[in-house]
Amino acid sequence: MQYWRLALALSAGLWSVAAAHAQPVEYEVLATTGELGPGMPPGWRFTRFDQPFVDELGRVTFLAQFNSGQAVYRTTGIDPQVLVRTGETPPGYEAGDELGSIRSLDHVNRAGDVGLEAWIEFGDSSPTLLGTWTYKDDAGLRGVSFGGLRAPGTTSVMCSGQAHWYEYLMSNAGHVAIYNHLCGTGGNDRQGIWASDENGENLRLVILENRPTEILPNTDVVFFREPQSINSQGTVVFDAFLEGDGITEANDYVYCAWNAQNGYSVVAREGDPVPGFPPTVTYEQIEGVRVNDLGHTMVWATVEGPGISEAWDQVILSDRDGNGLEHVYREGMQAPQQPPGATISYISDVYFNNKSQIAFMSRVAGSSDYFWSEGGPPGLTFVARTGQSVPGFDEPYVLTSFQTYETGGGYGPEPVFTDSGRLVFLGEISTQPTDPTDTRRRYYISDAAGELRDILPPGTQLDVSSVPGSPDIRTVDGKSFRLAGSANDADQVAALAYFTDGSSAVVLVSYADACLADVNGDGNASPADFSAWVAAYNASASGCDQNGDGQCTPADFSAWVINYNNGC
């Protein structure tokens, strides 16, 4: 009878179902406030941690604070190991020169290379300098650039103090791109971008404000912002306003790519024809450009021309298929997994990973914000939207807004879009309409099974003890604002946990691969799971959706067979 019902169901269409089994999650506490700091003087205990990062080897790097100093640690599977600490002489410096306060730990790339800002204090009483440093396993700690020292390619010096305008990026190979201003004689507070080689050495001038440029013939650069991206080949992407021959308000804004081997190339320019559209359709406003480690480019822009209206004037282009820039997504398109006629509008915050997958935010015929991603099943899929219920709380909470980093805003890091297609993002939630003033900030990840997961749900109990047989259980505080530093392709997230007793810890959150074929949940893929899948199909229940398209259809039977043959 069960199989007869299955046959009827297969001919009856499809149902929306709950997502398949969520990925199992594990928590590993790596360091806790109050503990003695490994590799530090006797009695030095952790007092605070700053933003942690996880690399592709699953190693977590974090900045630890002590009462009398700081250290950058990396976990190695045993105890955290000190990479950099204050009070020591960096390689290449003289005895008496010491690393002073570490201002910030800013970057850890896929290979585990570190980017940080710190002061160097000189034993001969020379002025203390604030610099950008890198740490690589094969090269150790190196200074890349310092405020107060000459800026390469100029006769002026880098501004000191790393003011609000200062930004730098690090590639997955270790290149550094720096955005700063010039100070001192002849500096005139001009903007500049500089880039290093993969060891943080040989810093070169890329572009300087109010100076002739080779971007276009007979033009000067009058303004630009911080670099938008740098890839593992050292290609730096930035935007610029130009003036000079043939430059008007309609074509003075360009996005450029630069590297040490090939110099400049124009990626997109306002007023130029948009690839894939009639020649009369041009770029009105270029919102963003990224170049990934494969050398592929993504352009997000507003276009104008005959046949273009405000309802469909935003586009996302890419050359990822090897055919040059071409249209991938466009405002006005049908929104995936939404009712017919529900269309994408107001595209914003576009992300491009190193597999050339795209994720972005938009509206859908209303006031809700949606997050979409190519990281799950084939094609663009829904990740989250404002107004939806979120996991992690006993009482109903809804996602009220996505929050991304704003300089000085204190919101936290940008969403992470990993090369495995996961999205990690910060959201503001509340109990609207019950109590809209009860707002909290939480970090979420879209897991491999398509479920939205609170990275460290409130009430989670973690054993912070490092002594076998002597547990020390602490409870995650639901009101804490945490920084989730990064995520890797193995579905691991580095996070800070704040506990109800006021202590905190660095935690590695790992999501194991979900065994989709294990429909009955006994931990094994076995013939019994076929009967369980049939029952799930007939009930439109969790476990039916084996291909991750958010639906329960006949295609899921073939997907279950594939998942079963792949094993668990």
Where are these regions (language model features)?
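Intrinsic low-complexity/disordered segments
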Residues: 18-20
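N-terminal secretory signal peptides that target proteins for export/translocation
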Residues: 1-3
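Exposed boundary/loop context
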Residues: 6, 51, 124, 516, ...
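Cellulosome-associated attachment modules in secreted, modular CAZymes
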Residues: 511-568
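Short linear sequence elements within intrinsically disordered, low-complexity coil regions
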Residues: 8, 78, 98, 398, ...
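Conserved "turn/edge" positions that cap or connect secondary-structure elements
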Residues: 22-514
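Bacterial N-terminal signal peptides
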Residues: 5-16
